Each structure stands twice: as C-alpha cells, then as structure tokens.
Amino acid sequence: MSKVTQISHPLILHKLAFMRDKKTGSKDFREMVEEVAMLMAYEVTREMQLETVEIETPICITKCKMLAGKKVAIVPILRAGLGMVNGVLKLIPAAKVGHIGLYRDEKTLKPVEYFCKLPQDIEERDIIVTDPMLATGGSAIDAITLLKKRGAKYIRLMCLIGAPEGIAAVQEAHPDVDIYLASIDEKLDENGYIVPGLGDAGDRLFGTK
C-alpha cells in the first residue's frame, strides 16, 4: 500500500487557511498555491537518491552528497495543477514539465482526457504529479495510469487538500504511488466537492469559471 504523508508545517497551515477563505482573491490565492507547493516540495523530494561526489573547495578536496543524477519531471493535471508547478521548479529548476489535460464531467464526475504532452524520456524520470484537489481521485488515477502506459515507473502525487474517499481510491488503483497532501479534509459532499475544501482551485487560480 502506498504511503500517505500529510505535511502539516505551520507555514503551510497558515497559508492554507487564507486559501480556504472565500474572500481571498485570485492574485493572493495564486501566490499562496505556489508558495505552499514550494514548501511541500521539500518533503516530497526527501527520499530522492543521493550519491557521493568529490568536490574541490577553496581549501581542500572533500566528499559531498548530491542528487544521484536521476532526472525529474513535474506533471501538472490541467488546469489547476499548473498553479503548483513554479513552486516546485524553484527547488528543482532543471526539471522538465509535462502536461496532462483532464476535466471532470459534472454529471458523471468521471475525468475526460483532452491533452497530453510529456518529456520523451518520461520512463527515466522521477515524476511529481501536481493537482491541488484530490476529491474522488478519478483525475489522479487516470493521469497516473496514462503515465504508466507511457513507461513511467517512479511517480509521486502531490496535492494541497484531499478527501479520504479520493485518497483511498488512488491507493487502491495505484498502491505503488505515494501521496503527499497539506490537508486531509473531512469528506466529499453529494456533488463530489471536498468539505470544507477551498472551492474550485482552477477557478480561484485563474479568475474564470
């Protein structure tokens, strides 16, 4: 079974409270999504492999730890996942960015794919999938399935908030994919929205519906 990590750092919780507030406008919401993603990325990358290298300092030659040469790809689920990308890129500026376009059918609540563009060497990369909301889990499950069909093997899922139902669904469908969240909320309502949630992340990020 995959590991579920709730990253409850005080700065993350503080910013998340502002993001939940319906009075917070798109500009501030967008900035805080990026900031929280950057703070979360510290924990999401904790288990990346290191290797020992020899470095010459101004004083002497010494051995240091560096990332083990494994390439990283950030794959946002469009459109809301885009809001988290720059925060992760600030810590991993050499990462490539793929895109998976999925939207949720409001009647069936099922995800529908409309776009997919990934790095050609996706099978060699350590992948961080970003999506602010893990509600039913349908979009995340489909995005991860698509990545695996393209050869991806090393995948982490990074969300701002999630419902227990969505977390359980992803774990059942992809028990090898670890999940990282800033908050595990109470439940889904009858419309499939996270409670208490923060509204529609895409709408609030971009100021459109």
Curated annotation (Swiss-Prot):
<dbReference type="InterPro" id="IPR034332">
    <property type="entry name" value="Upp_B"/>
</dbReference>
<dbReference type="GO" id="GO:0000287">
    <property type="term" value="F:magnesium ion binding"/>
</dbReference>
<dbReference type="InterPro" id="IPR050054">
    <property type="entry name" value="UPRTase/APRTase"/>
</dbReference>
<dbReference type="GO" id="GO:0005525">
    <property type="term" value="F:GTP binding"/>
</dbReference>
<keyword id="KW-0547">Nucleotide-binding</keyword>
<comment type="similarity">
    <text>Belongs to the UPRTase family.</text>
</comment>
<feature type="binding site">
    <location>
        <begin position="131"/>
        <end position="139"/>
    </location>
    <ligand>
        <name>5-phospho-alpha-D-ribose 1-diphosphate</name>
    </ligand>
</feature>
<dbReference type="GO" id="GO:0006223">
    <property type="term" value="P:uracil salvage"/>
</dbReference>
<keyword id="KW-0021">Allosteric enzyme</keyword>
<keyword id="KW-0460">Magnesium</keyword>
<keyword id="KW-0342">GTP-binding</keyword>
<comment type="pathway">
    <text>Pyrimidine metabolism; UMP biosynthesis via salvage pathway; UMP from uracil: step 1/1.</text>
</comment>
<keyword id="KW-0328">Glycosyltransferase</keyword>
<keyword id="KW-0808">Transferase</keyword>
<feature type="binding site">
    <location>
        <begin position="199"/>
        <end position="201"/>
    </location>
    <ligand>
        <name>uracil</name>
    </ligand>
</feature>
<dbReference type="Pfam" id="PF14681">
    <property type="entry name" value="UPRTase"/>
</dbReference>
<dbReference type="InterPro" id="IPR005765">
    <property type="entry name" value="Ura_phspho_trans"/>
</dbReference>
<protein>
    <recommendedName>
        <fullName>Uracil phosphoribosyltransferase</fullName>
        <ecNumber>2.4.2.9</ecNumber>
    </recommendedName>
</protein>
<comment type="function">
    <text>Catalyzes the conversion of uracil and 5-phospho-alpha-D-ribose 1-diphosphate (PRPP) to UMP and diphosphate.</text>
</comment>
<dbReference type="InterPro" id="IPR000836">
    <property type="entry name" value="PRibTrfase_dom"/>
</dbReference>
<feature type="binding site">
    <location>
        <position position="200"/>
    </location>
    <ligand>
        <name>5-phospho-alpha-D-ribose 1-diphosphate</name>
    </ligand>
</feature>
<feature type="binding site">
    <location>
        <position position="194"/>
    </location>
    <ligand>
        <name>uracil</name>
    </ligand>
</feature>
<dbReference type="GO" id="GO:0044206">
    <property type="term" value="P:UMP salvage"/>
</dbReference>
<dbReference type="InterPro" id="IPR029057">
    <property type="entry name" value="PRTase-like"/>
</dbReference>
<feature type="binding site">
    <location>
        <position position="79"/>
    </location>
    <ligand>
        <name>5-phospho-alpha-D-ribose 1-diphosphate</name>
    </ligand>
</feature>
<feature type="binding site">
    <location>
        <position position="104"/>
    </location>
    <ligand>
        <name>5-phospho-alpha-D-ribose 1-diphosphate</name>
    </ligand>
</feature>
<dbReference type="GO" id="GO:0004845">
    <property type="term" value="F:uracil phosphoribosyltransferase activity"/>
</dbReference>
